[in-house]
């Protein structure tokens, strides 16, 4: 089980701003080794209660809230990560549990016992939450990510574009999964994650986009139709 606690800033920027920042970062810090030429896809299945508790708490701006998701980086992946993200004031805590493809498929089909049988306290905690609040699969979200990393303060900077989703087919291993765009193709979500404090050159880089800082959730964006959410 992986446990990460860090601060996180999000900005909604356009493609021109993203290109300028990416060019700057390419000459300043390391690119993520998983990037390849054009970045990499991220696909997540989000779970929520029957009453959409997590969605509603995000919409209402509740300070302490959570999201539960199952994540893969390819429909051909042999494993998936079951994750809980918790908002704790200015911090985001993310805990992850690795599941086999078979376990992940069972989870998608509603068999949450794979969490209980994981031998992990975190898995047992998630099982209890999902059973107590009657969590069900709600939406699949996919986007294209290009990432940069710096060892100082565990800085990670990501550019997410082409955000798309569906609320019908929850099989994240489906190669032919039909997804619909939920964000303008001209927009990019910039995320800056770090421990402690941001280094001065990163702060300087962000000055032109400071006014674009937002509290955005890809999960909520994906559910804008089903929950009458407007971004």
Task: List each model region and its residues.
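Phosphate-end processing signature that detects enzymes handling 5′-triphosphorylated RNA
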Residues: 1-231
